[in-house]
């Protein structure tokens, strides 16, 4: 299959796509009405008291040649992130064992590459096989993939491949110049053709407007089928990156984005991802009420802070929520 960027979303067209217009209308609703609609949809497809738990490990950190304006792992920015080589298999599997013992259902592995070299992909495939043998779901994010590379990961048993769109087609060029939006869609098509589930979302708070948020969610929702997993990130502004001086996003705006994602992609897992450390327990509770049902679990998320496991467990207890087993 191929995924082409619709010309109606590739430029700032006067008439937005029906999906985009519908999502823009959702984002403009009074918050109580929006959350009510999102929770109603959520209950039709999921147990609203359960949260899917994923853990993310950086298996190759820093030195990425891409110029993503938000990313401390880009070689374009001097932020003190030391580039590392791809990890050996044994410590990755040990980290996966610890994650499973802590309650994680899915183990995600991220490498800061533009795209993987084939010899590195062989080692990643062995990691996938080892994590699968532990009884966990697997996800990797390695950059752009060729169709044969996606097929190699599928043969290793990979469950999910993460490749985010980041933002709307219109706003994308102000954040990233070293790969195109279509490059990202091509990787998603290769992953889908290989029979791997897609994990794909974006980042809120990079200076985009509400229409850009609607454009991101519409592009995701219009994928056929939509991603099985949709991570929604709040920008973590790292000093020294292009977006390092960005103001924090209003938590209510973040909740609105979660709710619109849930309504527009009713069967997808909607994950609270980067930036959750800055959200209060009350803001996270609103996100769960708005349809979020997945988190990254663990004290770090690649190179940024994440809520402590003890804090998450205490929050789940207070809310009467349980981890999906």
Swiss-Prot record:
EC number(s) from the headed UniProt entry: 2.8.1.6
Cofactor dependence: [4Fe-4S] cluster; [2Fe-2S] cluster
Enzyme class: transferase
Cofactor binding annotation: Binds 1 [4Fe-4S] cluster. The cluster is coordinated with 3 cysteines and an exchangeable S-adenosyl-L-methionine.
InterPro entries per UniProt: Aldolase_TIM (IPR013785), BATS_dom (IPR010722), Biotin_synth/BioAB (IPR002684), Biotin_synthase (IPR024177), Elp3/MiaA/NifB-like_rSAM (IPR006638), rSAM (IPR007197)
Keywords, ordered alphabetically: 2Fe-2S, 4Fe-4S, Biotin biosynthesis, Iron, Iron-sulfur, Metal-binding, S-adenosyl-L-methionine, Transferase
Residues where [4Fe-4S] cluster binds: 64, 68, 71
Pathway: Cofactor biosynthesis; biotin biosynthesis; biotin from 7,8-diaminononanoate: step 2/2
Binding positions for [2Fe-2S] cluster per the UniProt entry: 108, 139, 199, 271
Reaction it catalyzes: (4R,5S)-dethiobiotin + (sulfur carrier)-SH + 2 reduced [2Fe-2S]-[ferredoxin] + 2 S-adenosyl-L-methionine = (sulfur carrier)-H + biotin + 2 5'-deoxyadenosine + 2 L-methionine + 2 oxidized [2Fe-2S]-[ferredoxin]
A Pfam family it matches: BATS
One BP annotation, GO: biotin biosynthetic process
Keyword Transferase assigned: yes
SMART domains registered for this protein in UniProt: BATS, Elp3
Coiled coil: none
Molecular function per GO: 2 iron, 2 sulfur cluster binding; 4 iron, 4 sulfur cluster binding; biotin synthase activity; iron ion binding
PANTHER family: BIOTIN SYNTHASE, BIOTIN SYNTHASE, MITOCHONDRIAL
Entry similarity comment: Belongs to the radical SAM superfamily. Biotin synthase family.
Subunit structure as annotated in this protein's UniProt entry: Homodimer.
Function per UniProt: Catalyzes the conversion of dethiobiotin (DTB) to biotin by the insertion of a sulfur atom into dethiobiotin via a radical-based mechanism.
Record's protein name: Biotin synthase
UniProt source species: Acidiphilium cryptum (strain JF-5)
């Amino acid at each position: 299959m191929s995924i082409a960027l619709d010309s109606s979303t590739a430029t700032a067209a006067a008439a937005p796509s029906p999906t985009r217009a519908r999502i823009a209308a959702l984002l403009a609703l009074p918050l109580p009405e929006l959350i009510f609609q999102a929770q109603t949809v959520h209950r039709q497809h999921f147990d609203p008291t359960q949260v899917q738990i994923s853990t993310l490990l950086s298996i190759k950190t820093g030195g990425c040649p891409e110029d993503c304006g938000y990313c401390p792992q880009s070689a374009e920015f001097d932020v003190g992130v030391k580039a590392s080589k791809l990890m050996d298999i044994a410590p990755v599997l040990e980290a996966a064992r610890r994650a499973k013992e802590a309650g994680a259902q899915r183990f995600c592995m991220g490498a800061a590459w533009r795209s993987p070299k084939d010899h590195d992909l062989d080692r990643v495939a062995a990691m996938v096989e080892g994590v699968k043998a532990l009884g966990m779901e697997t996800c990797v994010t390695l950059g752009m993939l060729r169709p044969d590379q996606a097929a190699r990961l599928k043969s290793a048993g990979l469950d999910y491949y993460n490749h985010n769109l980041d933002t709307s087609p219109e706003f994308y060029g102000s954040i990233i110049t070293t790969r195109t939006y279509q490059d990202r869609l091509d990787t998603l098509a290769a992953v889908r053709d290989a029979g791997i589930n897609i994990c794909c979302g974006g980042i809120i708070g990079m200076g985009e407007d509400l229409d850009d948020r609607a454009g991101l969610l519409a592009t995701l929702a219009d994928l056929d089928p939509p991603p099985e997993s949709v991570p929604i990130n709040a920008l973590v502004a790292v000093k020294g990156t292009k977006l390092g001086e960005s103001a924090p996003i209003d938590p209510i705006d973040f909740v609105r984005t979660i709710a619109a994602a849930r309504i527009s992609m009713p069967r997808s897992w909607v994950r609270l991802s980067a930036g959750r450390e800055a959200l209060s327990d009350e803001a996270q509770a609103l996100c769960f009420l708005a349809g979020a049902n997945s988190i990254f679990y663990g004290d770090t998320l690649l190179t940024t802070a994440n809520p402590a496991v003890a804090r998450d467990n205490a929050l789940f207890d207070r809310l009467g929520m349980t981890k999906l087993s």
